[in-house]
């Protein structure tokens, strides 16, 4: 049909959707191993076209001509965590080290999407662990957060997944993760509470068994 051909033509003529990239023109994006195949991008774009019609819009008007393509590319980026392995990322930067005090990376920016409404939630993640002969490159902690956040999520599961990945790879004496986030599904719709912030935590090892360790962690992440 004419509508489908319009969408397909836009996709076929776009190098970002034909295996050479997904969302931008820089080298990192063009070689992004997490990109989606062109046929999936085309299917997603056609679905967005249908959604636009469903809400009463005209997908053929000037301002919306490229919207299906743009939304598909955005969703591919926002869900790229499905195509990345956080444990493999951690394993690339594990080092033997005798340090045995707490390691904390706090105020890691997170952006994710609620799986119930596909609306954003965003905030900060605080990640700590106590080494047991092994440490990991600090940037890898932030990358693990990023990989799990770039999926459809609930904050509770996201917090646990970060903890479990670090625990499974490093086998530390304990892991502590706290996430504080604002959910657009509570701000833009539903109860419409603009200032609500959700806090979740997931602990293991000494962060559970030692009250002083847990207390130190929670004190350190306070503003």
Curated annotation (Swiss-Prot):
It is an enzyme of class 3 (hydrolase). Keywords: GTP-binding, Hydrolase, Metal-binding, Nucleotide-binding, One-carbon metabolism, Zinc. Zn(2+) binds at residues 114, 117, 185. Belongs to the GTP cyclohydrolase I family. The lineage of its organism: Bacteria, Pseudomonadati, Chlorobiota, Chlorobiia, Chlorobiales. HAMAP family: FolE. It comes from the Bacteria. This is GTP cyclohydrolase 1.
């Amino acid at each position: 049909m004419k509508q489908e051909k319009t969408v397909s033509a836009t996709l076929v003529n776009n190098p970002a959707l034909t295996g050479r990239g997904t969302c931008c023109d820089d080298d990192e994006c063009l070689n992004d191993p997490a990109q989606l195949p062109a046929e999936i991008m085309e299917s997603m774009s056609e679905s967005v076209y249908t959604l636009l019609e469903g809400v009463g819009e005209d997908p053929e008007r000037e301002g919306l001509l490229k919207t299906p393509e743009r939304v598909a590319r955005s969703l591919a980026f926002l869900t790229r965590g499905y195509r990345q392995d956080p444990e493999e990322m951690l394993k690339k930067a594990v080092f033997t080290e005798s340090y045995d005090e707490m390691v904390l990376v706090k105020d890691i920016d997170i952006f994710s999407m609620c799986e119930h409404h596909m609306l954003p939630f965003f905030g900060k993640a605080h990640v700590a662990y106590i080494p047991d002969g092994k440490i990991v490159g600090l940037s890898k902690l932030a990358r693990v957060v990023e990989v799990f956040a770039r999926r459809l999520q609930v904050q509770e599961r996201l917090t646990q997944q970060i903890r479990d990945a670090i625990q499974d790879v490093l086998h530390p004496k304990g892991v502590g993760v706290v996430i504080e986030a604002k959910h657009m599904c509570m701000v833009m719709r539903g109860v419409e509470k603009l200032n609500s912030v959700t806090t979740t935590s997931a602990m293991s090892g000494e962060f559970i068994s030692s009250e002083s360790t847990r207390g130190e962690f929670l004190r350190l992440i306070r503003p």
